[in-house]
Amino acid sequence: MTFMNSIILYILVGAASGTLAGLLGLGGGVVIVPTLAYIFSQMGISHDHIMHLAIGTSLTTMVFTSFFSTLAHHKYKRVEWQVVKKFVPGIIIGSILGTFLSNQLETKSLTLIFAIYLILISIQMFIKSNSDLNKSTKKSKLKESYPILTLGGMGVGTLSGLLGVGGGTLTVPFLTLLRKKIHNAIGISAASGLFATLFGTISYIGFSLGTPNLPEGSFGFVYLPAVIVIALVSSIFAPLGSKLSGVLSAKVLMRVFSIILLFISIKLLVTYVT
C-alpha cells in the first residue's frame, strides 16, 4: 500500500469515526480497529503486532474524538456530569485491566474476540432498531447508585482497553437501564468514553514501550502518523454527528450500521483467524 493510499483511508475512517461518535455515542473503534488492521497488514507490519497496534492507535485517536464529541454534547446540555463523575473511578480501573489483558493475548486471539464482539453488537443494534429506543427507561427498576455506576464503569473501561473501543456500545444500553433518555445516554457515553480512552491509551503505551519490530513512527503500540490524521479529521466530524443525532432517525442508522458491522466481523474472521 502506498503512503497516499493509507492517508486517504485514514481520512475516511476519521470522518466515519467522528460522525459515529457524535451521532450514536460510539467512540468509532468498531470502524477504526478493523480498518487499521487492514492497513497495517498491507504495510508489511509483523502479524504478531497488527491487532495490538490497531487497538493502541484506535484508543489514542478516540481521546481526541471523544473530547470534541463531549464538548458538542455539553453544548446541547446532554451530558449529566454528576453521572460521569460516579462512572469515572470504575472506568479507570477497567481501562488499566483491559489494556493489561490485551497485551497478554496474541493477534489471532484478539481478532477472534473483536470479531465476536462486533457480531454481538450488530445483533444488539439490529434488535434495538426495531424497538422503542427509550423503552428501558420506562420499565427498568435499576437504580442510579454509586456502586452500580462504578461496576458499570469497570465493564466499560475493561472493554475499551481490551479492544480499543470507546465503550459506547455498552454505556448507552446500560444508561438506558438507569432510565436515562437516549440522547442523554449518548452524551454521557461520549464523556465517559473520553476517560476510558485516555487512561486506556496511557496504560497501553506503558505496557508496550520497548516492543521490538514496530514500524517507524510508533510510540509503543501507537502509530503516530495514523493518530494525527484520524484524530484531526474525526475531531472535525464529531460535532457534525452531534447535530445530526437530533435530526436523523436513530433507528434507521442503527439498522444500517448493524449490517455493516456484521460484514466487517466476517471479513476479520476470514482474513486473520481462519
Language model feature labels by segment:
Residues 170, 174-195:
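Small-residue-rich alpha-helical segments with characteristic i,i+4
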